Amino acid sequence: ANFWDAFQLIPVSRGFWHAEHWFDVFPVRHHVPGTAYGLCLRGAFFYSGDTRPIPEVVAQYADGTMPLVHDCDLHGNPSHTGLPDLLREYPAEIIRQMLVYHYASAADGTALAAAGLRVAKAGDRLRLPKPQPAAQAHAASAGAI
């Protein structure tokens, strides 16, 4: 079987509709520009994808209620955020809304939690808030990024 037979690839620009919801898509900071993107269902979740800190992007989406799921390990690299980067680049009120993922080991997850971060663990489930009404989310995305 061909690996690509399992996927239907559809190019998108600033977002896409799925199940009557508007999903924003945005470029993130990765070692090769244009190779990594984030995703947001406004009101429900923000997902950073693989990225260096992107406080200017997060600020456009953070609403104080939805989880901001963000790439973070103990040490950063050209494609990923490290703990010092996260603490330096984001204000405390944004960090409190974050759920970090993409760390190297369970021990690293424990260290991130000890630093005061909420850490996603294998098998966790995250209850998401109800997303914004689709028309409102779509209209808001027109002014984003």
What would you call each of these model-derived segments?
Residues A1:
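Active-site HxH/HxHxD metal-binding segment of metal-dependent hydrolases
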